[in-house]
Amino acid sequence: MTSSPVSVLIHGASGRMGQALLRLAVQDPALQVVAAVIRRAPAQRVVDGVPYFAAAELNGAPAFDVAVDFSLPQGFDPVLALCVARGAALVSGTTGLDEAQRQALADAAARIPLIWASNFSLGVAVLNELVERAAAALPGWDCDIVESHHVHKQDAPSGTALTLGE
């Protein structure tokens, strides 16, 4: 039995994670990238068989099963609203969300399949568990998180550091 590929919209396709996702997704026969969304109007509408859309054109994107969002906080609300309106799943790694956006995320999780994480790496998931265990074992202790990043890092402190600090 052959199933059809999962149709994917990649939101934030011009960023580091978005570009990495695009490279991998177009090679996976189980996936079909139906749209790549970037902030500004693209120079080319189709690149390597993938249709590109400006963020302002998001509502004109074709139907998709799941949106994968690694954008910026200011681009997050429209993709969340589109997923809810279309009943599509959302996977998001966008960090720096404000309280209203976090609440909208929680509300949407009751209506659509949704996963959000500040960092999707296995190493950080294990680190997060270890930090929780250490905090429980050492009540009354203080700790600091010190981090360094490449020069292109857009959010500091990082979403990962903020999650660990929670």
Predicted features and spans:
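Extreme N-terminal starter segment of soluble prokaryotic enzymes
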Residues: 4-8
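N-terminal Rossmann NAD(P)H-binding glycine-rich loop of SDR-like oxidoreductase domains
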Residues: 11-22
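NAD(P)-binding Rossmann-fold cofactor-contacting core
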Residues: 24-47
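Hydrophobic beta-strand scaffold residues
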Residues: 33, 52, 90-91, 113-116
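Short acidic low-complexity segments
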Residues: 49-63
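N-terminal Rossmann-like NAD(P) cofactor-binding module of classical short-chain dehydrogenase/reductase
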Residues: 67-68
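Rossmann-fold NAD(P)-binding glycine/threonine-rich loop
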Residues: 80-81, 85-86, 93-114, 125-134
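Conserved anion/nucleotide-ligand pocket segment
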Residues: 122, 126-166
